[in-house]
Amino acid sequence: MSAADTLAAADPAAGPSTRRAPAWVPSTRLLRSELRLVAGRRRNQAGLAVLAAVPIVMAIAVKVSRPGAAGDGPDFFGSITSNGLFVPLAALGVEITMFLPLAMSMLSGDAIAGEANIGTLRYLLTVPVHRTRLLLVKYLSLCIGAVWGVAAVAVPGALIGVALFGTGQLTTLSGDQIPFGAAVWRVVLVMLYLSAGLAGLAAVGLFISTLTEQPIAAAIALMIFTIVSWIADSVPQLGWLHPWLVVHLWLSFGDLLRNPIEGANVTQGLLVDLGYAVVFWLLAWARFSEKDITS
């Protein structure tokens, strides 16, 4: 069922004679129907299950493995056994590079291109729903989807981590310790920071989704954009470009685990995310507002 079908079912008697409701009511109904559509797709449910499985597998692997000498891996992995909250942090560090962007690619590909591909976009616009409002709802649903994706990693990771490795004071990257309640709050801040980064990437995906009627093509294009961004970020000769890459400061979420928090990179990262969100949403709006809906 598409968003158009869901919206029509929610208001079957809508017509010219129906009393006009306040502007925010249909917008809220459309958002709810869009979220139900996103949450109800089996592909999305399977994707969330895969995201949630990674921290569980990591925690079990660390639990059953023999302790050995520290290697060159992230500090989060070496600290997992000391506090279960390092499990979601380590899992987020792994999944933010590929799995979470892949999830956002699939969601953003379905946003506009998916509706056009199955022939419901034109009907959705005759409900009536203004194109600008529709695009805002689509992007807001992608932002909520980003939070869902990050939570699908962090929440199971925290639960399995606490169950296997316990709680207690968390040793920050600065070397001192903070109580468990403060540590949970730091994990929440990390979740919000990474969700903001994925929301910036989702704006790029939404723009790409307005350029085609093939959702798979839109998803692949966004993944190519993400991979190229990571590659460019790893090339020292392109240092002048690094501050402008949406992925450049994603891994700076470690600064939120220092005491006190080092906010310079985090603030810069949020500003870059906001810039991507504004610029690419406006590009999507410019394209979508003039798009000839033929399907």
Regions found by a protein language model. Name each.
Residues 2-10, 207, 211, 272-295:
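Junction motif at the cytosolic side of a transmembrane helix
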Residues 3-21, 52, 56-106, 136-202, ...:
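Secretory targeting signals
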Residues 35-51:
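Membrane-interface helix starts
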Residues 57-67, 212-248:
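Transmembrane helix segments
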Residues 104-108, 156, 204, 224, ...:
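Hydrophobic/aromatic residues in alpha-helical transmembrane segments
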Residues 105-123, 139, 293-295:
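Transmembrane helix boundary and interhelical loop/hinge segments in multi-pass membrane proteins
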Residues 111, 187-226:
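A structural motif at transmembrane helix-loop-helix junctions in multipass membrane proteins
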